Amino acid sequence: VMVGVSGGKDSVALTIGLAELRKYIGFDFTVQAVTLDPQFGGKPMDYTVLQELFARYGIPYEIRRTEIGPVVFDYRKEKNPCALCAKLRRGALHTAAQELGCNKVALGHHLDDAVETFYMNLWREGRIGCFSPVTYLSRRELTLIRPMLLATEQEVIGAVHAEGLPIVKSVCPADGVTVREQTKEFVRERCRTDHAFRQKTLHALQESGIDGWRPVHTGRGSFSITNEEE
């Protein structure tokens, strides 16, 4: 399982969580951490704290320097950079997984991410949609998994603080001023007046017919596995 590690709380928590899960799950698997350094401003980021953390847990870790930052902000000068950045990162992550011999790519999305994506698709594109918990990429022969989808952002933050996990602060020029950040604030406001807002949205996702979201009773988990080509 290759984990795409940005350095933020979600991907760091996911990496350590998967490494620790091997002790209890009943079958073994390998965890490989990979960071794609976008090199915003043409400068490499310092990921020393992550190198030290993953070394303590015995997790192989690779940093790949990319030109994603300069391409998005300097060459293309995107007014809405997130879509292009995400597309470039996806391609680079999938390539890294294949080159490293991994058949699964784990992403650190949590419940808040899913809720925000649901409303962003509704408002911006007028459609009911969200990423799937599990997605099979037939052309790449890779499976994307999102193991933390039922955890809230606050639960992830709590785990990071409890374990004292280090994070690398984002230096993206668009950080905090994106449409997602506006949607995140909407969700926060709704949750202040309706504490069940996230769970209600999760129920809507599960009843929406979106691939992979309808729960099934397996005895161990609630998500069905969907094969969806991307």
Give short role names for the model-derived ranges.
Residues V1, V5-D10, F29-V34, K43, ...:
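AMP-forming adenylation/ATP pyrophosphatase catalytic core
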Residues V1-F118, R124, Q154-G158, A162:
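ATP-dependent adenylation/nucleotidyltransferase module used to activate substrates
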Residues F29-Q32, I59-I63, R89-A92, S132-Y136, ...:
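Short, surface-exposed, polar/charged, turn-prone segments marking secondary-structure boundaries
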Residues T30, D112-E189:
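Catalytic subdomain that performs nucleotidyl-dependent activation
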Residues P38-F40, I68-P70, T135-S138, A151, ...:
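Residue-level detector of flexible, active-site-proximal loop/helix-junction positions
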Residues A86-A97, V134-R139, V187, C191-E207:
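Short, basic, helix/turn surface patches
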Residues L165-E230:
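The feature marks non-catalytic terminal segments
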